[in-house]
């Protein structure tokens, strides 16, 4: 099955699955689930525990330390949830000494699939959650680590909702910063008779965020106009050459003096990690840790 066919199959599956649960709300988090080695095992667990918190996260009694004064807020990708995206990284950051938080936003309350709603609306919910974290922890700023849409959506919060004053670092893992053509699927679908109506009417109704992440969408044009970054915020992007969702993979990259762009294969040429599993890749995880704590950064490779 070629990349376009794989993308089309995935789109049909996700659309068919989500169409029965279209109301968008801020989903609650429950007790922490176990650590997981991959998105596959995490998703299997999340089927029965869709509101599980990633290990070590969502402890509102946590107080930041002098070594790690900014809490870390994790932001998941389209159709994922906090647990299945972050059941690996969350525990790592907690053991490093961070206060870690991971909300479920932009999906049906208690549902498996989150981050499908209108992105500006979800960004507003995200901002409210950041305020909750700041109030609980006493911190003045947070750091954000996001995957896919979750690495791009906070930029709306930073640019339009006052978030730049409350964020120190934004790390994006395969973020959809400049959109995706889904290996040509977007153009292929829209070129079909009725394809535009299907994309905007059916997919857009079930998953507004999906349409908003198309290359050239009005949402992304607005987000990226006037530059990619905000003053006072440090940005790190980790992309993978084998990304099959954010395509071309270079559309993840940002430009600006406070940006550091990475590619997994520059650290391990044979790293085949793709879009979905990048949050579990050991190189990506270390690059996140480096971005959050540059004073103790070290260079990962194929083995470490």
Where are these regions (language model features)?
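Secretory targeting and sorting signals
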Residues: 1-28
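Serine-dependent carboxylesterase/thioesterase catalytic core
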Residues: 75-76, 100, 120-223
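Conserved beta-strand scaffold positions in the cores of enzyme catalytic domains, especially
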Residues: 72, 100-102, 170, 235-237, ...
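Extracellular/periplasmic catalytic domains that process cell-envelope and extracellular macromolecules
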Residues: 64-68, 94-95, 136-137, 145-146, ...
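Solvent-exposed loop/turn segments at secondary-structure junctions
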Residues: 77-81, 106-110, 147-152, 175-180, ...
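Extracellular secreted precursors and ectodomains with disulfide-bonded cysteine-rich loops/domains
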Residues: 60, 205-208, 266, 300
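Active-site catalytic motif of lipid deacylating hydrolases and related acyltransferases
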Residues: 33-53, 58-141, 188, 192-201
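C-terminal catalytic-base region of ester-bond hydrolases, centering on the histidine
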Residues: 192-193, 230-304
């Amino acid at each position: 099955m070629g990349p376009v066919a794989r993308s089309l199959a995935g789109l049909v599956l996700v659309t068919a699955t989500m169409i029965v649960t279209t109301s968008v709300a801020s989903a609650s988090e429950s007790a922490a689930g176990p650590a997981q080695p991959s998105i596959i095992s995490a998703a299997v667990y999340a089927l029965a525990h869709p509101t599980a918190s990633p290990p070590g996260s969502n402890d509102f009694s946590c107080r930041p330390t002098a070594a790690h004064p900014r809490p870390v807020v994790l932001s998941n990708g389209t159709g994922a949830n906090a647990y299945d995206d972050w059941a690996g990284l969350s525990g790592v950051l907690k053991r490093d000494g961070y206060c870690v938080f991971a909300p479920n936003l932009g999906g049906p309350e208690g549902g498996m699939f989150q981050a499908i709603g209108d992105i500006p609306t979800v960004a507003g919910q995200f901002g409210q959650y950041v305020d909750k974290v700041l109030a609980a922890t006493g911190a003045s700023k947070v750091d954000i680590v996001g995957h896919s849409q979750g690495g791009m959506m906070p930029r709306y919060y930073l640019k339009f909702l006052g978030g730049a004053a409350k964020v120190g670092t934004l790390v994006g893992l395969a973020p959809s910063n400049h959109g995706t053509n889904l290996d040509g699927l977007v153009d292929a679908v829209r070129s079909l008779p009725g394809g535009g109506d299907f994309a905007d009417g059916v997919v857009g109704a079930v998953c507004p965020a999906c349409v908003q992440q198309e290359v050239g969408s009005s949402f992304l044009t607005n987000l990226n106009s006037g530059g990619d970054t905000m003053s006072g915020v440090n940005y790190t992007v980790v992309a993978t050459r084998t990304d099959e969702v954010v395509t071309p993979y270079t559309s993840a990259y940002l430009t600006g003096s406070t940006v550091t762009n990475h590619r997994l294969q520059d650290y391990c040429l044979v790293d085949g990690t793709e879009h979905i599993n990048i949050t579990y890749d050991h190189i990506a995880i270390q690059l996140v840790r480096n971005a959050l704590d540059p004073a103790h950064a070290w260079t990962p490779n194929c083995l470490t």
